[in-house]
Structures are given as structure tokens and as C-alpha cells.
Amino acid sequence: MKYRSVLFVPGHEEKKIKKAYTLSADLIVLDLESTVPDDQKENAKKIITECNVNKNKTYIRVNSDLDLEFATKEKFLGILYFLL
């Protein structure tokens, strides 16, 4: 599928996550990588889960193997890997 618009959203900012799903982006990427401070990464996963996002239009950008485990368990549409 081709995406015309992709919106990246910091995974630890609940208000921005909720707002993203009211917009018309074709794909939303919830970021657990560089936009989330290290001390907020676990909290970001909790926020994403509690926001009950539309997983059929959501990718997760992961930072570590633990994030990858979370993304796989939650069954998001796709996963973007961290930068090397």
C-alpha cells in the first residue's frame, strides 16, 4: 500500500497521540526511539496501550529488543527499527 501521509508522534505524549488519530494521516508512527527520553520509554509503552490506538493504521518505531517485544505482542500494522 502507498501512504500519502505519515505522521510521527512521540510515544510518551498522550495528548499528541490522541490528536493524531483525529487527523487524516494515512499512517501514524508512534515513536519509542529518539523522540522519547530514556527515562520515559517504559511509560510511553503504557500510554500507547492505554490510548487504545487504531493498530490497523499504526507503526511503532522501536528503540530496543524490549520495544520490539512490545510492538510484536500488541500486533501493530508494522515496526520501524532503530537507527544504528
Residue ranges and their predicted role:
Residues 1-84:
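Expand to "…catalyze enediolate/carbanion chemistry for C-C bond making/breaking, isomerization
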